[in-house]
Design a protein with these regions (language model features):
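Glycine-rich phosphate/diphosphate-binding loop of Rossmann-like nucleotide-binding domains
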Residues: 8-38, 44-45
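Short glycine-rich or small-residue beta-strand-to-loop segments that form or flank ligand, phosphate
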Residues: 12-14, 19, 68-73, 147-148
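Conserved small/polar residues in nucleotide/adenosyl-binding loops
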Residues: 181-186
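Short glycine-/aliphatic-rich beta-strand segments at the starts of folded cytosolic domains
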Residues: 170-180
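N-terminal amphipathic/basic leader segments beginning at the initiator methionine
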Residues: 2-8
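Proline/glycine-rich low-complexity loops and linkers
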Residues: 57, 82-170
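N-terminal small/polar loop signature for handling phosphorylated ligands or for N-terminal nucleophile
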Residues: 29-82, 89
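Short glycine-rich anion-binding loops that position phosphate/pyrophosphate groups of nucleotides
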Residues: 16-17, 74-77, 153-155
Length: 187
């Protein structure tokens, strides 16, 4: 893509905790601000539940109509973290242990701490590219134009710097707010 091409993205927030109101989404603002700064216009944001069929359907729709799709949430160690397997299904790829990711997490944790739950975080679509995590070790991943990041805001934000060379944007998108106060004019 040339620098003058208009580049767009969608943000897909995945998590029942967001939809129930238990957790407030701050990732949308962080991602949109960062994307605008590198010349990527956010066209759409969706918040969906931790349900495989909904994730697959939504992801397939968004990845075909946007240059990039960024997901947050659902790549952690718990039973409801199903984003990685859903992405694999959306792309028709195997869901497997990522060998490089395994080495990274094995080195990150103390002996005996790299348990089954933590190992779940390095199961990804086959041939996924890692997105390194300078905060907590567990990497995100990308497949084609889809970038999967964790839902924890501070961790997600810390990983954005590692994406700069993977995202081709346009001119930065600037916005401002203008407040205009008026008083009624006498008739």
């Amino acid at each position: 893509m040339s620098k003058n091409t208009k580049v767009n993205a969608a943000i897909l927030i995945i998590g029942n905790e967001i939809l129930s109101g238990r957790t407030q989404d701050t990732n949308t603002s962080t991602l949109a601000t960062w994307l605008n700064s590198i010349g990527v216009k956010v066209n759409e944001v969706r918040i969906i539940p931790d349900q495989e069929e909904i994730i697959v359907e939504t992801l397939n729709l968004l990845r075909k109509s946007n240059n990039y799709v960024f997901t947050t949430g659902g790549i952690g160690p718990t039973h409801d973290d199903i984003t990685a397997q859903s992405v694999a299904k959306a792309f028709g790829l195997k869901y497997e242990l990522h060998k490089e990711g395994y080495k990274i997490l094995e080195a990150y944790y103390q002996p005996g701490e790299f348990n089954e739950g933590r190992q779940k975080m390095i199961w990804m679509p086959a041939n996924a590219d890692l997105i390194l995590n300078p905060t907590s070790g567990a990497p995100g991943f990308s497949v084609e134009n889809v970038f999967c990041l964790p839902g924890v805001p501070s961790i997600m934000k810390s990983m954005l710097g590692g994406l700069k060379n993977k995202i081709v944007g346009g001119d930065p998108i600037l916005s401002y707010t203008c407040l205009l106060y008026t008083s009624p004019s006498p008739r």
